[in-house]
């Protein structure tokens, strides 16, 4: 997203339709991509929100619109706009903070870079590390995973299962 000037805007799958509507209306995204298992709430949101240009789905229980888009996409690298700067938006994360009402925290390319640099130093990341992402993909763990990926580290994605996690840690 960031390389071509798009702003990533992940949504918390645990929220209800009204909360998601508020977040979407606040962030004003142009495209929403959902997994097939969330198609029911996506249809509900489509009935409430009229400014989204594209609603895409992926996965086995979906209309495959995202999968089709990817299959038909060019294999060449996208043209990188020259006007994307350090202080331009990169991603927005929503948090209930102290009030319980979702508020967007907009991160720039620069804030993401320095956050990743801080993590790299603090965790001493090296390419032989393996990152197990068990946190929420709609919040900061996804940025942490991007940092490990940028160092060439493999990422393990999983729904948290204590026994499975311990077995994976022991194997690695």
Where are these regions (language model features)?
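Structural core segment of the AMP-binding/adenylate-forming
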Residues: 3-71
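Short hydrophobic alpha-helices that are characteristic scaffold elements of the AMP-binding
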Residues: 1-6, 26, 139, 147-151
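Short hydrophobic/charged patches on amphipathic alpha-helices used for structural packing
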Residues: 21, 81, 163-166
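Short loop/turn segments at beta->alpha junctions
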Residues: 16-19, 108, 161
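Conserved pre-ATP/AMP-binding loop-to-beta segment of ANL
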Residues: 57, 74-94, 101, 124-130
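Conserved AMP-binding/adenylation subdomain of ANL enzymes
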Residues: 113-130, 138-172
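Conserved AMP-binding A3 loop
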Residues: 90-114
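Conserved S/T- and glycine-rich ATP-binding loop of Class I adenylate-forming
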Residues: 1, 32, 89, 95-98, ...
């Amino acid at each position: 997203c960031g390389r071509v000037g798009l702003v990533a805007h992940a949504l918390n799958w645990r929220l209800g339709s009204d909360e998601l509507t508020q977040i979407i209306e606040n962030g004003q995204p142009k495209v929403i991509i959902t997994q097939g298992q969330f198609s029911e709430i996506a249809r509900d949101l489509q009935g409430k929100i009229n400014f989204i240009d594209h609603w895409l789905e992926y996965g086995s229980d979906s209309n495959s619109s995202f999968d089709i888009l990817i299959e038909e996409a060019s294999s060449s690298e996208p043209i990188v706009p020259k006007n994307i700067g350090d202080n331009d938006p990169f991603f927005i994360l929503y948090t209930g903070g102290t009030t319980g009402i979702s508020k967007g925290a907009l991160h720039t390319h620069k804030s993401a870079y320095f956050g990743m640099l801080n993590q790299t130093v603090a965790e001493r990341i090296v390419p032989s590390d393996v990152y197990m992402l068990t946190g929420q993909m709609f919040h900061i763990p996804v940025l942490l995973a991007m940092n490990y990926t940028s160092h060439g580290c493999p990422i393990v994605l999983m729904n948290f299962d204590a026994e499975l996690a311990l077995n994976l840690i022991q194997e690695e």
